[in-house]
Amino acid sequence: MSIRFIYGRAGSGKTYFCLEEIKHKLNDGANHPLILLVPEQFTFEAEKYLLDMIERDEKMRAQVLSFKTLANRVFVEVGGLARQHMKACGKSMVIYKVLEENKEKLKVYSKASRQQGFVKKISEAITEFKRFDVTPFQLIDASEKIEKLGLKEKLEDLALIYSSFEEVLHKNYIDEEDELDLLSKKLEKSLQFEGAEFWIDGFTGFTPKQYKVIEKLLKKASRVSVTLTLDPSIDSIDPTHLFYTTKKTEEKLIKICETNGISVEEPVNLNKGIPKRFEHNKELAFLEKNFFSHPYEIYNEETKNISIFKATNMYSEVEEVARDIARLIRDEHMRYSDIVVATKDLKRYYKLVKAIFSHYGIPHFIDLKINITNNPIIVYVISIFEIYLKNWSYESVFRYLKTGFTGIDKEEINLLENYVLANGIKGNKWKERWEYRIDYKTDSLLMEEREKQIINKVNEVRERVYLPLEKFYTRFSHSKNVKEACEVLYDFLVENKLPEKIEKFIEEFKNRGEFDTANQYAQIWDIVVDVLDQMVEVLGEEKISLEQFARLISIGFDEYQIASIPPALDEVLVTSVDRMKSHNSKVLYLLGANDGVFPASSFEEGIFSDEERNLLSSLDLELDRDTKAKVFEEQFLVYTALTSASEFLKISYPIADHEGRSLRPSIIISRLRRIFPKIKVSTNIVEMDTDEENLNRVTVPLPTFNEMIKSFKKWNITGKIHPIWLEVYKWYRTKDEWKKKLEDTLEGFVYDNQIKRIPPLKIKKLYGEEMEFSVSRLEKYAACPFAYFVQYGLKAKERKIYGFEPPDLGIFMHNVLNEIAKALEKEELTWQEIDKEWCNDAVDIIVEEMVDKIPGYILKSSSRYRYLANRLKRVLSKAVWIISEHMKRSSFVPLGHEVAFGENQKYPPIKIVLSNGEEIKLIGRIDRVDVLEKEGETYVRIIDYKSGDKTLDLSDVLYGLELQLLVYLDAILESAFEGKANLSPAGIFYFKIDDPIVRADKDISDEELYKEIMKRLRLEGFVLKSLDIIREMDKLIEGTSYVIPASINKDGTIGKNTKGLTEEQFEILRKFVKKKSKKLAEEMLQGDISILPYKKEKETACQYCPYSSICKFETNFKGNDYRRIESKEEKLWSIFEEEVKEDGSQVDGRTEGSDNNEG
């Protein structure tokens, strides 16, 4: 019985020495067991090395074991497997059960027990206690010695949780940590390792339980050899030293030997000369010797085997690695298996490496286990419970449906989703048949056949979603315990053919070459069943609610991770520096060498803070290292990484993260640059157009093709290109498989997103043959022809979301005001005769009736919307009262409300004859027309209600953006209504429907408040510049009017603040608007669909346009620019007058004729 230490710095050949010794022992005929004991994650690699060195028939005598496989061997021999092994999933479930049962007794963790991730935190704490041989009794004992209340109560809580967990666990099970306890006991009875020889390799340190097992092995074995990464020539080692941990490991093993009378042999020191790994590479040998030396030497020669790459971001960093790997394979004749790519943060790099390496055709294995919680199969199972717990919320239902496992196809899901979103369906509404209207013809009260068909289809899909789930919830509610609940869920999954659907997906993935995804799906069903089995085993007879079940199954799934397909013979290994253990890699790419990342500068403290750990340590309660010690141990990780390759070390770091935030280089970079002043540092921050740089970008066909296109784009802008890309182009042109892609891509250089015209015959089919247009449609065309085409030609619609949006608000308010006008007529009242009380009562009744008569109407769907309905009542009451006040001060009287002009309406449409002889009709609906009879003349004013701020700007009229009021005026003036021939314009106005908030620094009187409200809600637009008409519109005017945008000076003249037009100006604008309408209609019907949005100061047509993703409008793109709107009034009038003068057309009745001289 003896122990022997094998010392050696990194690369000195410690593993090789062990394997060589085993080989020689076998050759010498050794008949006792020869065991290489390594960490669990390195067993596969160690077995491979061993097999390469020995004959296969000798494998039985020489074996590679980990502590886990060693335990299994002993248990098979002497027993110990009577109790079942509890998996991490079952362990978490027991902890959840313990927390639930003891939540009233817990002091610190009574509320935290239900927090996300808390079960995992407690699980890690219990694991730590067991690994370091800490019992619940020791926790209680420590708590009694501590005065600090927070830590005292924390220890008491943890002791209670831990002891309760152990009680449940040890009834029928053991967990992974118990195995080592059991192993150390059972080793005494084991005979298979009597006289065996052990080589323990690859460990930096051991847990207290592993030390106990080693102690037993030392008593059984003839010799135990332990490799230590250590330099025995270093005398004093403090906690900050690189080899501190391994030195402490040696001391503990020596102490065990002294206690048990086991001899310590003369150590083997491999630290002689150049380390074996670097015997042909003096740069890496120099690095190993000096990187952590104080003082260090400087390497003054050219550095060829170590390099640094400074990348703009993570993507370009990984792409540079991919390019360099392609070069090594092509030019240096390396094998992929010679290369390792490592990083401290593999989760952050995983997707990038996977995508870019696949793009470059680099075979690779990513040594990372992936959480399964986002896998569609798991999402499907979890969503079954979420739907119930979240009351059939939109998110939970469609998360479930979009997994692809419900048997409902995508088209049906889209139909259902649009309907649910448009109508805000959730909760009990899923139980009922749906009859909510679909917005085809909103003015039709009768449901059309097409609408009925869609609603029937929606309800058929609804039943296929609702009925199976409702049946499941009913059956689940009758289950008496966890076992029965698991059976109900399993039956539901099988009845809905989940295993068969998974198999179908696996086949599809394999056919597409997505073997990694196929491998993941293949494991998931077994995991689902395993979690259910664990629940039955651990909590089978426990009563459980659906909410608890959902939480438990989620906790179970959280414990599972899926590994990728095991590596092939020739693949690049992509791994984390924490798991890196490759003795035969020639090249290491070390990614993400950023400050604070590698080496890490901080760690999470866990259940105990560093201060608490140190306090417990002073009470002889030894736990894992504190974060400070872990930071020092990062040095050893850096050392291991930097010395793992035998030929090339390539370190890289990005200067910015994916959000553009700057990142600093790691201390590793600065230290390398000091030790190797001539080290090559390359970057892609500024692309160099050198022969070498361009040649490096030529790698494998697909990425090289993309690089060529990038060069062509620059050529297109700068007129310069490196000759190499012309040669590359010739290569692709000669390859049949690349010809089509090359042609299609080059066509993109002359791509223009502008589609100028569509043939008139096609455009008519798209817009409709009736040639009838509302004025608002012309205005939309003027704002941007392409947006108009998408909306009215392609009939594109935004998905309707259940809500009360500005358009809904506007329609609702208009309808209420129209109903008010009807109520006045019915009660034979005028606007002048009503008071505030009548306004409030009438609005209240009308709003309630409108809300009640529409099934599922949004304004009664929730307390929030009922509050909005009440607010609307206040706003509309104020609007009705203000209109009444306007009327009381005015001589004008309403001619009509909601006055329609068009075919079969009271007033005919405005007909415009186009240049080609075709006729279009302008139609519309005027909110209110007021008239005044005066001295044989009838004056007309047009009023349009608006729910938001709206001004009438003549520049908008010039560009066709504001035609409505003038066309409405023209419709009435040209109608010769009721035989009246002498019709004149009095004004065109917008009226804002609002209930303004008046803020004042001091108390104000009712009169002042009234005036302020009237001022804010006066009409906005243009009035006839006539003193008589202004006084008829506001009979009480003194100075500035509270009704219209006008003022009268003290001398009785019209004030300069009046927004007025003369009769001649009204006539000019009417003629201009007709001409503009004709021009817009002609452009529209000739198929002009140019992408030409307007811009007026900061406002553009694109601001709220839903079609920007279709047109791709960008001002820096060829042919893309705004139509800019001038707003100087003096200029505008000269343009209006010029346009009207050029137009020699005559107005005949209501028809606008054509003229060949029109510009």
UniProtKB/Swiss-Prot annotation:
ATP binds at residues 8-15. GO terms for molecular function: 4 iron, 4 sulfur cluster binding; 5'-3' exonuclease activity; ATP binding; double-stranded DNA binding; helicase activity; metal ion binding. It comes from the Bacteria. Keywords: 4Fe-4S, ATP-binding, DNA damage, DNA repair, DNA-binding, Exonuclease, Helicase, Hydrolase, Iron, Iron-sulfur, Metal-binding, Nuclease, Nucleotide-binding. It is an enzyme of class 3 (hydrolase). InterPro entries: ADDB_N, DNA_helicase_suAddB, P-loop_NTPase, PDDEXK-like_dom_sf, PDDEXK_AddAB-type. Its cofactor is Mg(2+); [4Fe-4S] cluster. Signal peptide: none annotated. Binds 1 [4Fe-4S] cluster. The keyword Iron applies. GO terms for biological process: double-strand break repair via homologous recombination. Pfam families: ADDB_N (PF21445), PDDEXK_1 (PF12705). Its EC number is 3.1.-.-. Coiled coil: none annotated. Despite having conserved helicase domains, this subunit does not have helicase activity. This is ATP-dependent helicase/deoxyribonuclease subunit B.
